[in-house]
Amino acid sequence: FSYRRVRSTFRKAVNTQEMEKCMQQEITRVALDAMGGDNAPGELVKGAVDAVNGRSDIKVLLVGQQDVVEKELKQYSYPKEQIEVVHAEEVIETAEPPVNAIRKKKQSSIVVGMNMVKQKEADAFVSAGSSGAILVGGQVIVGRIRGIERPPLAPLIPTEKGVSLLIDCGANVDARASHLVQFAKMGSIYMESVMGKKNPTVGIV
Protein backbone atom coordinates (compact mmCIF):
# COMPACT_ATOMS: atom_id res chain seq x y z
CA PHE A 1 0.00 0.00 0.00
CA SER A 2 1.58 3.31 -1.03
CA TYR A 3 0.76 6.99 -0.81
CA ARG A 4 1.69 7.40 -4.48
CA ARG A 5 -0.76 4.68 -5.58
CA VAL A 6 -3.62 6.18 -3.56
CA ARG A 7 -2.87 9.63 -4.99
CA SER A 8 -2.78 8.25 -8.54
CA THR A 9 -6.02 6.31 -8.05
CA PHE A 10 -7.73 9.30 -6.46
CA ARG A 11 -6.78 11.56 -9.35
CA LYS A 12 -7.91 8.98 -11.89
CA ALA A 13 -11.22 8.68 -10.06
CA VAL A 14 -11.88 12.41 -10.30
CA ASN A 15 -10.44 12.84 -13.79
CA THR A 16 -12.86 10.65 -15.72
CA GLN A 17 -14.11 11.57 -19.18
CA GLU A 18 -17.41 12.61 -17.64
CA MET A 19 -15.66 15.01 -15.26
CA GLU A 20 -13.58 16.44 -18.10
CA LYS A 21 -16.73 16.91 -20.16
CA CYS A 22 -18.39 18.54 -17.18
CA MET A 23 -15.43 20.88 -16.72
CA GLN A 24 -15.55 21.85 -20.39
CA GLN A 25 -19.23 22.66 -20.02
CA GLU A 26 -18.49 24.47 -16.74
CA ILE A 27 -21.45 22.72 -15.13
CA THR A 28 -21.21 20.34 -12.17
CA ARG A 29 -24.23 18.10 -11.62
CA VAL A 30 -24.97 17.51 -7.95
CA ALA A 31 -27.59 14.93 -6.97
CA LEU A 32 -29.13 16.07 -3.68
CA ASP A 33 -31.18 13.77 -1.45
CA ALA A 34 -34.25 15.93 -0.96
CA MET A 35 -35.76 13.50 1.56
CA GLY A 36 -32.77 13.16 3.91
CA GLY A 37 -32.43 14.95 7.24
CA ASP A 38 -34.67 16.24 10.00
CA ASN A 39 -36.10 19.19 8.04
CA ALA A 40 -36.53 17.57 4.63
CA PRO A 41 -37.56 18.43 2.07
CA GLY A 42 -38.04 22.12 2.91
CA GLU A 43 -34.51 23.02 4.00
CA LEU A 44 -32.94 20.90 1.25
CA VAL A 45 -34.98 22.60 -1.46
CA LYS A 46 -34.19 26.02 0.01
CA GLY A 47 -30.49 25.17 0.03
CA ALA A 48 -30.63 24.03 -3.59
CA VAL A 49 -32.30 27.27 -4.62
CA ASP A 50 -29.76 29.35 -2.70
CA ALA A 51 -26.94 27.43 -4.39
CA VAL A 52 -28.10 27.93 -7.97
CA ASN A 53 -29.10 31.54 -7.38
CA GLY A 54 -25.55 32.24 -6.22
CA ARG A 55 -23.67 30.63 -9.11
CA SER A 56 -24.20 29.47 -12.67
CA ASP A 57 -21.74 26.57 -12.80
CA ILE A 58 -23.84 23.93 -11.01
CA LYS A 59 -27.03 22.03 -11.64
CA VAL A 60 -28.86 20.48 -8.68
CA LEU A 61 -30.76 17.24 -9.23
CA LEU A 62 -33.27 17.04 -6.37
CA VAL A 63 -33.89 13.35 -5.71
CA GLY A 64 -37.11 12.58 -3.87
CA GLN A 65 -40.88 12.32 -4.04
CA GLN A 66 -41.66 14.49 -7.03
CA ASP A 67 -44.98 15.98 -5.95
CA VAL A 68 -43.64 16.90 -2.50
CA VAL A 69 -40.43 18.43 -3.85
CA GLU A 70 -42.15 20.37 -6.62
CA LYS A 71 -44.62 21.80 -4.11
CA GLU A 72 -41.70 23.20 -2.10
CA LEU A 73 -40.04 24.59 -5.24
CA LYS A 74 -43.11 26.60 -6.22
CA GLN A 75 -42.48 29.19 -3.52
CA TYR A 76 -39.06 30.15 -4.91
CA SER A 77 -37.66 31.99 -7.89
CA TYR A 78 -34.64 30.33 -9.51
CA PRO A 79 -33.12 29.53 -12.93
CA LYS A 80 -35.29 26.62 -14.09
CA GLU A 81 -32.52 25.02 -16.12
CA GLN A 82 -30.37 24.63 -13.00
CA ILE A 83 -32.73 22.54 -10.89
CA GLU A 84 -34.28 19.24 -11.92
CA VAL A 85 -36.48 16.93 -9.84
CA VAL A 86 -35.69 13.21 -10.08
CA HIS A 87 -38.48 11.06 -8.69
CA ALA A 88 -37.67 8.56 -5.92
CA GLU A 89 -40.71 7.09 -4.24
CA GLU A 90 -39.14 5.63 -1.10
CA VAL A 91 -37.32 7.10 1.90
CA ILE A 92 -34.74 5.34 4.08
CA GLU A 93 -35.36 6.26 7.71
CA THR A 94 -32.48 6.74 10.15
CA ALA A 95 -33.64 3.88 12.38
CA GLU A 96 -33.71 1.31 9.57
CA PRO A 97 -30.92 -1.30 9.35
CA PRO A 98 -28.65 0.15 6.62
CA VAL A 99 -27.87 -3.06 4.72
CA ASN A 100 -31.50 -4.17 4.53
CA ALA A 101 -32.63 -0.68 3.56
CA ILE A 102 -30.16 -0.42 0.66
CA ARG A 103 -31.07 -3.90 -0.59
CA LYS A 104 -34.83 -3.56 -0.32
CA LYS A 105 -35.54 0.10 -1.04
CA LYS A 106 -34.27 0.34 -4.61
CA GLN A 107 -36.47 3.39 -5.24
CA SER A 108 -35.27 5.33 -2.20
CA SER A 109 -33.69 8.75 -2.67
CA ILE A 110 -30.31 7.50 -1.43
CA VAL A 111 -30.16 4.48 -3.76
CA VAL A 112 -31.46 6.44 -6.77
CA GLY A 113 -28.98 9.27 -6.15
CA MET A 114 -26.01 6.94 -5.81
CA ASN A 115 -26.99 5.06 -8.95
CA MET A 116 -26.99 8.39 -10.78
CA VAL A 117 -23.34 8.85 -9.81
CA LYS A 118 -22.50 5.28 -10.80
CA GLN A 119 -24.21 5.74 -14.18
CA LYS A 120 -22.47 9.13 -14.76
CA GLU A 121 -25.77 11.00 -14.62
CA ALA A 122 -24.45 13.07 -11.69
CA ASP A 123 -20.95 14.14 -10.66
CA ALA A 124 -21.60 14.01 -6.91
CA PHE A 125 -24.22 12.87 -4.41
CA VAL A 126 -25.04 14.77 -1.21
CA SER A 127 -27.31 13.53 1.57
CA ALA A 128 -28.13 14.48 5.15
CA GLY A 129 -29.99 11.18 5.59
CA SER A 130 -29.01 7.91 7.26
CA SER A 131 -25.22 7.85 7.64
CA GLY A 132 -25.24 4.06 7.79
CA ALA A 133 -27.21 3.74 4.57
CA ILE A 134 -24.92 6.25 2.85
CA LEU A 135 -21.81 4.31 3.88
CA VAL A 136 -23.30 0.97 2.79
CA GLY A 137 -24.59 2.44 -0.46
CA GLY A 138 -21.25 4.05 -1.14
CA GLN A 139 -19.53 0.67 -0.96
CA VAL A 140 -22.19 -1.46 -2.65
CA ILE A 141 -23.34 0.95 -5.38
CA VAL A 142 -20.61 3.50 -6.08
CA GLY A 143 -17.65 1.41 -4.93
CA ARG A 144 -14.40 2.15 -3.12
CA ILE A 145 -11.12 3.51 -4.45
CA ARG A 146 -8.68 0.67 -5.13
CA GLY A 147 -6.49 0.08 -2.09
CA ILE A 148 -8.96 1.54 0.41
CA GLU A 149 -10.46 -1.03 2.79
CA ARG A 150 -12.90 1.09 4.81
CA PRO A 151 -14.88 4.23 3.90
CA PRO A 152 -14.55 7.01 6.51
CA LEU A 153 -16.73 9.97 7.44
CA ALA A 154 -14.77 13.20 7.11
CA PRO A 155 -16.34 16.55 8.12
CA LEU A 156 -14.50 19.85 7.84
CA ILE A 157 -14.07 21.43 11.29
CA PRO A 158 -13.62 25.23 11.65
CA THR A 159 -10.45 26.28 13.48
CA GLU A 160 -8.63 29.52 14.29
CA LYS A 161 -6.39 28.94 11.28
CA GLY A 162 -9.12 27.94 8.83
CA VAL A 163 -10.46 24.39 8.67
CA SER A 164 -9.28 20.92 9.60
CA LEU A 165 -10.53 17.58 8.30
CA LEU A 166 -11.63 15.08 10.97
CA ILE A 167 -11.29 11.59 9.48
CA ASP A 168 -12.78 9.19 10.58
CA CYS A 169 -15.54 10.59 12.83
CA GLY A 170 -17.62 7.49 13.53
CA ALA A 171 -18.00 5.31 10.47
CA ASN A 172 -15.62 2.71 11.91
CA VAL A 173 -15.55 1.65 15.56
CA ASP A 174 -12.88 -1.05 15.18
CA ALA A 175 -10.37 0.47 12.76
CA ARG A 176 -6.97 -1.20 12.57
CA ALA A 177 -3.67 0.65 12.28
CA SER A 178 -3.65 0.07 8.52
CA HIS A 179 -7.05 1.73 8.24
CA LEU A 180 -5.82 4.77 10.16
CA VAL A 181 -2.91 5.07 7.73
CA GLN A 182 -5.34 4.93 4.81
CA PHE A 183 -7.56 7.59 6.42
CA ALA A 184 -4.52 9.82 6.96
CA LYS A 185 -3.44 9.49 3.34
CA MET A 186 -6.94 10.16 1.99
CA GLY A 187 -7.31 13.15 4.29
CA SER A 188 -3.96 14.57 3.18
CA ILE A 189 -4.83 14.17 -0.49
CA TYR A 190 -8.23 15.80 0.04
CA MET A 191 -6.83 18.79 1.92
CA GLU A 192 -4.14 19.30 -0.70
CA SER A 193 -6.17 18.63 -3.86
CA VAL A 194 -9.56 20.06 -2.88
CA MET A 195 -8.84 22.61 -0.16
CA GLY A 196 -5.54 23.80 -1.64
CA LYS A 197 -3.49 23.28 1.53
CA LYS A 198 0.13 22.45 0.75
CA ASN A 199 1.84 19.75 2.83
CA PRO A 200 -1.04 19.28 5.30
CA THR A 201 -0.16 18.08 8.79
CA VAL A 202 -1.61 14.78 10.03
CA GLY A 203 -2.33 14.25 13.72
CA ILE A 204 -3.91 11.48 15.79
CA VAL A 205 -6.71 12.41 18.17
Language model: regions and residue ranges:
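Short, acidic/small-residue loops that bind anionic groups at enzyme active sites
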Residues: V136-G170
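Aromatic (phenylalanine/tyrosine) cluster motif
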Residues: F1-Y3, F10
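Short, charged beta->alpha transition segments
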Residues: V112-M116, R150-I157, G187-S193
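Residue-level detector of flexible, active-site-proximal loop/helix-junction positions
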Residues: E90-I92, E160, V173
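Ligand-binding beta-strand-loop-alpha-helix segment within the catalytic cores
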Residues: L165-G203
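Contiguous, glycine/small-aliphatic-enriched amphipathic segments in soluble metabolic enzymes
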Residues: F10-V140, E192-G203
